[in-house]
Structure formats: C-alpha cells, structure tokens
Swiss-Prot record:
Keywords in alphabetical order: DNA-directed RNA polymerase, Nucleus, Transcription
Signal peptide as annotated in the record: none
GO cellular component: nucleus; RNA polymerase II, core complex
PROSITE patterns, per the entry: RNA_POL_L_13KD
Coiled coil: none
UniProt record, GO biological process: RNA-templated transcription; termination of RNA polymerase II transcription; transcription by RNA polymerase II; transcription elongation by RNA polymerase II; transcription initiation at RNA polymerase II promoter
Keyword set includes Transcription: yes
Entry protein name: DNA-directed RNA polymerase II subunit RPB11
Subunit structure: Component of the RNA polymerase II (Pol II) complex consisting of 12 subunits.
Length: 120
C-alpha cells in the first residue's frame, strides 16, 4: 500500500519544522502557512476562529493530499494588522475556549458523580 506509516503522520522528521510561513504574493497583507503533521482537525478549527476576527478578510485551508498530514492555511488581514498576529490571537482564543470547556466538563462530571453516589 502507498500510505505512509502511521507514526509518520504525527512525528516530525529530523530538521523538519512544524510551521513554514511564506508571504502570499497574490494578495496584500497575506501569508500562506504550511503546517506539518496536522490535518483537517486543526485546520478547520483555526480557520473558523480566524473568521471570528473582524480584521481578518480571508482565511481558508487546504489539505493537498489525504495521505500526507500537511495543510496550508491562507490568511489575509486588513492593513496594519499582521496575519501572524491574527494567527496568534486565534490560537490563544482556542486555548481559552478549550480551557473553559475542560472546566465545565469537569464540573458537570463531578456533579454527576456526586449525584450518583448520593443515589445509593
């Protein structure tokens, strides 16, 4: 089979970097960021969060081939707002939302456990 070994989907090779940022020559104030060893899960999450930012004019990603864990994210922002800053802000927002989700989940889990213990 032509599919790569499973471990190649998440382990970076020697000298391989997680991100590569290139300016997008087709649009002003835009970059193309290549994420290695990541897939639709992260691509769609970041794209959706970027589109919540009013200063982001365009955000999209594409996975070039399903066998390879790599996607390209294109970000275009308003003038005076660096696309790298938009990415940092989106990632920080995602981290905060996941932290809140974890807290809410743990609270509900503890309440359910307590209620189940009281039932006996």
């Amino acid at each position: 089979m032509n599919a790569p070994d499973r471990f190649e989907l998440f382990l970076l090779g020697e000298g391989e970097s997680k991100l590569k940022i290139d300016p997008d020559t087709k649009a002003p104030n835009a970059v193309v960021i290549t994420f290695e060893k990541e897939d639709h899960t992260l691509g769609n999450l970041i794209r959706a969060e970027l589109l919540n930012d009013r200063k982001v004019l365009f955000a999209a990603y594409k996975v070039e081939h399903p066998f390879f864990a790599r996607f390209k994210l294109r970000i275009q922002t308003t003038e005076g707002y660096d696309p790298k800053d938009a990415l940092k802000n989106a990632c920080n927002s995602i981290i905060n939302k996941l932290g809140a989700l974890k807290t809410n989940f743990e609270t509900e889990w503890n309440l359910q456990t307590l209620a189940a213990d009281d039932a006996f």
